[in-house]
Amino acid sequence: MNIADYKGGVWVFAEQXDG
């Protein structure tokens, strides 16, 4: 499951729920 979160103007892709 690939989740893309927009943080600080940067797309952060979390595939393993890291962070």
Curated annotation (Swiss-Prot):
Going by the UniProt record, its keywords in alphabetical order are: Electron transport, FAD, Flavoprotein, Transport
On assembly, the entry states: Heterodimer of an alpha and a beta subunit.
Role summary = The electron transfer flavoprotein serves as a specific electron acceptor for other dehydrogenases. It transfers the electrons to the main respiratory chain via ETF-ubiquinone oxidoreductase (ETF dehydrogenase).
The text of the family note is: Belongs to the ETF alpha-subunit/FixB family.
Names of required cofactors: FAD
Highest taxon, organism lineage:
Bacteria
* Protein name per Swiss-Prot or TrEMBL: Electron transfer flavoprotein subunit alpha
User: Which classification does the entry list for the species?
Assistant: Bacteria, Bacillati, Bacillota, Clostridia, Eubacteriales
Organism field: Clostridium pasteurianum
Comment on bound cofactor: Binds 1 FAD per dimer.
